Amino acid sequence: MESEEWLLYEFYEVYYVLFPYFAWFFSVFLDTRPRHTLFGAKIGKNTVIGNGRLFNPERTIIGDNCFFGYDAILSGHVYEGGRLYLKTVRLGNNVTVGANSVILPGVEVGDNVIIAANSTVPKDRVIPPNSIWIRGKAIPRKDMPPADEVAEAIDTAKDGQ
């Protein structure tokens, strides 16, 4: 049984590595949602994956009304010290995953969460509901500073680089 699971896992790996090279052809015939669902992902209503990538769709549970930004990655596996770590990733309802973000295995994201663009959510992290994940921490939405302060902080960070 273990060898069958490994073979299936390798099939997924090859599929996801090669698929982008042929995506222009397949995109005419196969939308991303049915493709991910076909491979075992559980995806809620009104969820848009678009150009986001689900590695290990069999280890993916996504709630309703979620949105993935361009090239966002949700992965159910990671290699650590030569060992393969596999765990299911769960996203609640009304979750927005920013462009170029990476979500690693074992992550559980609550409802009404925004994961900022270019963010990484480390493995086994739990993000509470009604928060924004940015710079490695979850900020409750009620504690968020006004938009002009956020814009100023972003400009300051850009100037410092």
Residue ranges and their predicted role:
Residues 17-90, 94, 100-107, 124-125:
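Left-handed beta-helix
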Residues 70-71, 75-161:
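Glycine-rich hexapeptide-repeat left-handed beta-helix
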